[in-house]
């Protein structure tokens, strides 16, 4: 499967076979790194990393993956990039495309990364937008494949919580594209948009995926192998929305009881991180003092239990991002 010079903007752009090719390559690269026999296939390549939103995992994954493969990466932090402020997206794309072999973008509007791809003349990779998080999806799929013990098209997973944004959208599309049994458990007001749901159903017709959207969290998790969640308040939202979001989502918190409701003693917990699972951060302590919650979207008991595979998931960000870059740029 030839993925040379391909943009990586959203999973909707790819066939199930192409997504599986990325996963297979990521698994190969992971094995090679751990065995100390990694072959550098991106020597002499230069990659620009544009971050309009800050990040730990995405930045580190791109930088380490590039370095492992012999490439150099330039990090453009939020305060350093002029994109859309003093210089148009179109002009930024054309400038960076002359200097770099690929561009990663992490920011707000999906339209921005699509416009970069239109004008850059080099592969563009989506590190996260408000609408989609495709590199996270490869990491999640690889992690589920490693822990499932059966093919992904025989695997069921649920996402519970606020499903309107990049994680809910992307997991729904991922499951549909890979023929999985995917469930969304959320208040209807926090479901993905009608357009995303329609796209998922269209993909499911091709792959045999099963799609369920329900307001009942226990129904969503029944029989699944994996339960995913994400933070209830996104980057940049005001503190005032916390009370409203907690009131809406308190029944979707991942607790030992919700894990048990899966009926699967081997069920695993997944989270793209960072997670509010205790009081050990300033935000976590503020939430406890303000709302009396020790842990928000997931309890400490679940997060730190053997069911939690979030750090396998985080590690796989690097291996799957490396696969995206090697597929596009590798010799």
Curated annotation (Swiss-Prot):
Keywords for this protein: Amino-acid biosynthesis, Arginine biosynthesis, Cytoplasm, Transferase
Protein EC: 2.1.3.3
GO biological process: arginine biosynthetic process via ornithine; citrulline biosynthetic process; L-arginine biosynthetic process
Binding residue positions for carbamoyl phosphate: 55-58, 82, 106, 133-136, 272-273, 317
Major location (coarse): cytoplasm
Reaction equations catalysed: carbamoyl phosphate + L-ornithine = L-citrulline + phosphate + H(+)
Location within or outside the cell: Cytoplasm
Name of the protein: Ornithine carbamoyltransferase
Species per Swiss-Prot/TrEMBL record: Neisseria gonorrhoeae (strain ATCC 700825 / FA 1090)
Gene expressing this chain: argF
Source superkingdom: Bacteria
Residues reported to bind L-ornithine: 166, 230, 234-235
Family of this protein: Belongs to the aspartate/ornithine carbamoyltransferase superfamily. OTCase family.
Function noted in UniProt: Reversibly catalyzes the transfer of the carbamoyl group from carbamoyl phosphate (CP) to the N(epsilon) atom of ornithine (ORN) to produce L-citrulline.
HAMAP family linked to this entry: OTCase
Pathway in which the depicted protein is active: Amino-acid biosynthesis; L-arginine biosynthesis; L-arginine from L-ornithine and carbamoyl phosphate: step 1/3
Top EC class for this record: transferase
GO molecular function, one term: amino acid binding
GO cellular component assignments: cytoplasm
KW Cytoplasm (keyword) present: yes
